[in-house]
Design a protein with these regions (language model features):
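A short, basic/flexible loop-to-alpha-helix module at the beginning of a structural domain
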Residues: 1-7
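N-terminal Rossmann NAD(P)H-binding glycine-rich loop of SDR-like oxidoreductase domains
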Residues: 8-29
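Conserved glycine-rich Rossmann-like NAD(P)H-binding loop of the short-chain dehydrogenase/reductase
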Residues: 30-46
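Residues at the starts of beta-strands that form the adenosine-phosphate
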Residues: 32-34, 56, 120-121
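Adenine-nucleotide cofactor-binding loop residues
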Residues: 40-42, 65, 87, 105
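Short, conserved SAM-binding/catalytic segment
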Residues: 47-54
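Conserved Rossmann-fold cofactor-binding substructure of NAD(P)-dependent oxidoreductases
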Residues: 57-79
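Conserved Rossmann-fold NAD(P)-dependent oxidoreductase catalytic core, especially the SDR/UDP-sugar
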Residues: 79-82, 86-145
Length: 149
């Protein structure tokens, strides 16, 4: 596990339930700058309130499906934590194409950006549903794990 002290860290899905907790923890670990990337302006606003507008945080609106925007977010990052995902099993079952675009293509976009920009450490947040998947969500997260390896 890399040290986060004095590092520039990007968190995708920063406004989500897991991403927002990761962001709070990273600030307590002494990051130099925290790049909070999320598709939802409202989620980023809520996160900004939760972390009391910590001056080390930058809030970046964007979608992991958008390669160019994602690549701009990755610039200068020492560490990337990928928490962006469609994670609700029921919604992924109803919207399998969207789940694939976000969970698989979005992960590939991030890995490509990290390789291009020589990011030293990248961490994927996954789920127990990726082991022996029985759902669209589990299958897409399993594929994301394979991309990340």
């Amino acid at each position: 596990m890399p040290s986060f002290n004095n590092k520039i860290v990007l968190v995708t899905g920063a406004g989500g339930s897991i991403g927002s907790e990761i962001c709070k923890k990273l600030l307590s670990l002494g990051v130099h700058r925290l790049k909070c990337f999320d598709i939802s302006e409202y989620s980023l606003y809520r996160l900004s309130q939760k972390i009391e507008n910590d001056e080390r945080a930058r809030f970046l609106i964007g979608d992991v499906r958008d390669k160019e925007r994602l690549e701009r977010a990755v610039v200068d990052a020492d560490i990337v934590i990928h928490a962006a995902a469609l994670k609700h099993v029921k919604f992924c079952e109803f919207n399998p194409d969207e789940a694939f675009k976000t969970n698989v293509n979005g992960t590939q976009n991030l890995v490509d950006a990290c390789r291009k920009l020589d990011v030293k450490h990248a961490i994927l947040i996954s789920t127990d549903k990726a082991a022996r998947p029985q759902s669209v969500m589990g299958t897409t997260k399993s594929l994301a794990e394979k991309i990340f390896i």
